[in-house]
Structures are given as structure tokens and as C-alpha cells.
């Protein structure tokens, strides 16, 4: 089989560090009957050890050459191959509670994470390799430099933990950035539930639009000082000082006023 060259347009960096591969598979804890979806199987570094433990493994791959390669592997009979763009993939089309895993293309990681949040209710857990900078933003706490819109939105849906730091030399070709593996488990009991999720998402986006400005300035088209103080938010605070549940409370308060 001829060697596959990584394609930049697909954001391909192939994991080759056997220790990291083993750590990821151990973190996923696959059981034979689990419904597992792997995003971007690439050269099957994670695919093979997962397939050994599973009766069936769904894989989503956009690269036709890799799809052809997957079909020739000794364990191909265990694979259900979905060829296409994962951003267009219907995760709900696969029945059952799912475990989702993957070495995500860094160039589409943020829109993909937001897409996956939409199917959180049908997910057991997710384990992803991502740019470390992105993982730091995902798990960041309020009042930290990395805390922002991405963290607020994903923390609404998931409990998240950085599991493994991964250096560039663990890949071929080596990326120019450090990577990390994150575990994402859907939140079972939210501190607060947004009554109008679209309103909540718009509010959070506006709140972080200009980080140096106060929450009063960033949200002036949606909320006045009285609204902010009604849910115990200081109008002089900046967006990164405000916990996710406060954004939910503010959104619900404003939505209630509009009724």
C-alpha cells in the first residue's frame, strides 16, 4: 500500500506516538457493544485499537484516499465508513447513546464543537485531540485569560477535563502548535437551563465581542444596569469575570421580561 501524504486542506496531522494512542483508547474505555463514532480516522492509529475492542466502529472521513485505505484494513469488516464532511454529518442518524472520539482537524475544531453540542443529549462522552490553546479555552474558569465565549457555551453542555498534553513530535507531520486531549461529558444536572437558547447564545456572543469593554457597554442593546443587577451582575465587570450560570440567569430574566 503506497504511503499517504498528509493534506493541508484537510488539516491532516497523523498521530504516531504509541503511548498517547494507548492513553486515548484507555480513556475512552470501549466496550464491545458501545456505539462509537471516530471523526477523522486518518491512518487508523486510534481506529485499530478501538476496532479490536468493539463489535462495530463508525468512522467519518472526508479524504477519499483514506476511505479507500480503510476498506483494505484487516478489521475493515468492523468498520461502518461514512464518507463526507463531518460538519454536514447527521450524528442523530446513528441510533443509541454515542461515544465520540477523534483527532480533530484544527481548522474546523470550533464550528465542529458547536455542532456536537447540539447532539449532547445523545452522547455518553467525547474524547478529542485538539490544539492545546483551544482546550485551555474550553476548560477555562471565570476570571482567567483563556475564559471566553467558547468556554461559556461548551460548559453549558459539558463537564470538561484536559487529560493529556501532546507535543508536536507525536504527529507526522509535526504541527507548529502543542496539542491536548480533552474529555467532554454531557452535563446531567445544569445549574440553570436557558429558556431561549438562541437568546442565550446571542447574549454570550455580544458579551465577549469586545473583551476590554465592560459588560454594560457590550450588552447595552439587550440589557440595562437594572437588568444586570437583578441577577447579581456588576455592570462594571468585564465579560470574563462572569460565570456561565450568570449568563443563563440574565438571558432568562430578559426573556421573561419580553413575554
From Swiss-Prot:
InterPro entries: KsgA/Erm, rRNA_Ade_diMease-like_C, rRNA_Ade_Mease_Trfase_CS, rRNA_Ade_methylase_Trfase_N, rRNA_adenine_dimethylase, SAM-dependent_MTases_sf. PROSITE patterns: RRNA_A_DIMETH (PS01131), SAM_RNA_A_N6_MT (PS51689). GO terms for cellular component: cytosol. S-adenosyl-L-methionine binds at residues 13, 15, 40, 61, 85, 103. It is found in: Cytoplasm. It is an enzyme of class 2 (transferase). It holds the Pfam family RrnaAD. It catalyses: adenosine(1518)/adenosine(1519) in 16S rRNA + 4 S-adenosyl-L-methionine = N(6)-dimethyladenosine(1518)/N(6)-dimethyladenosine(1519) in 16S rRNA + 4 S-adenosyl-L-homocysteine + 4 H(+). GO terms for molecular function: 16S rRNA (adenine(1518)-N(6)/adenine(1519)-N(6))-dimethyltransferase activity; RNA binding. Keywords: Cytoplasm, Methyltransferase, RNA-binding, rRNA processing, S-adenosyl-L-methionine, Transferase. Its EC number is 2.1.1.182. Belongs to the class I-like SAM-binding methyltransferase superfamily. rRNA adenine N(6)-methyltransferase family. RsmA subfamily. PANTHER family: DIMETHYLADENOSINE TRANSFERASE, DIMETHYLADENOSINE TRANSFERASE-RELATED. Specifically dimethylates two adjacent adenosines (A1518 and A1519) in the loop of a conserved hairpin near the 3'-end of 16S rRNA in the 30S particle. May play a critical role in biogenesis of 30S subunits. This is Ribosomal RNA small subunit methyltransferase A.
Amino acid at each position: 500500500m503506497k504511503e499517504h501524504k498528509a493534506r493541508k486542506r484537510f488539516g491532516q496531522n497523523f498521530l504516531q506516538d504509541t503511548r498517547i494512542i494507548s492513553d486515548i483508547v484507555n480513556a475512552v474505555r470501549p466496550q464491545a457493544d458501545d456505539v462509537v463514532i471516530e471523526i477523522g480516522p486518518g491512518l487508523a492509529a486510534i481506529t485499530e485499537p478501538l476496532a479490536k475492542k468493539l463489535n462495530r466502529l463508525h468512522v467519518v472521513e472526508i479524504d477519499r484516499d483514506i476511505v479507500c485505505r480503510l476498506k483494505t484494513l484487516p478489521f475493515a469488516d468492523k468498520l461502518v465508513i461514512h464518507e463526507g464532511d463531518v460538519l454536514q454529518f447527521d450524528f442523530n442518524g446513528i441510533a443509541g447513546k454515542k461515544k465520540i472520539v477523534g483527532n480533530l482537524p484544527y481548522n474546523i475544531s470550533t464550528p465542529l464543537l458547536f455542532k456536537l453540542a447540539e447532539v449532547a443529549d445523545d452522547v455518553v462522552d467525547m474524547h478529542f485531540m485538539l490544539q492545546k490553546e483551544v482546550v485551555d479555552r474550553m476548560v477555562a474558569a471565570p476570571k482567567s485569560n483563556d475564559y471566553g465565549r467558547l468556554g461559556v457555551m461548551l460548559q453549558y453542555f459539558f463537564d470538561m477535563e484536559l487529560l493529556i498534553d501532546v507535543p508536536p513530535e507525536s504527529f507526522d507531520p509535526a504541527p507548529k502548535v502543542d496539542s491536548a486531549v480533552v474529555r467532554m461529558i454531557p452535563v446531567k444536572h445544569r445549574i440553570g437551563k436557558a429558556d431561549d437558547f438562541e437568546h442565550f447564545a446571542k447574549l454570550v456572543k455580544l458579551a465577549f465581542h469586545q473583551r476590554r469593554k465592560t459588560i454594560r457597554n457590550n450588552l447595552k442593546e439587550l440589557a440595562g444596569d437594572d437588568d444586570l443587577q437583578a441577577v447579581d451582575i456588576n455592570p462594571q465587570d468585564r465579560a470574563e469575570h462572569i460565570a456561565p450560570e450568570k449568563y443563563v440567569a440574565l438571558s432568562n430574566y430578559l426573556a421573561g421580561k419580553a413575554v
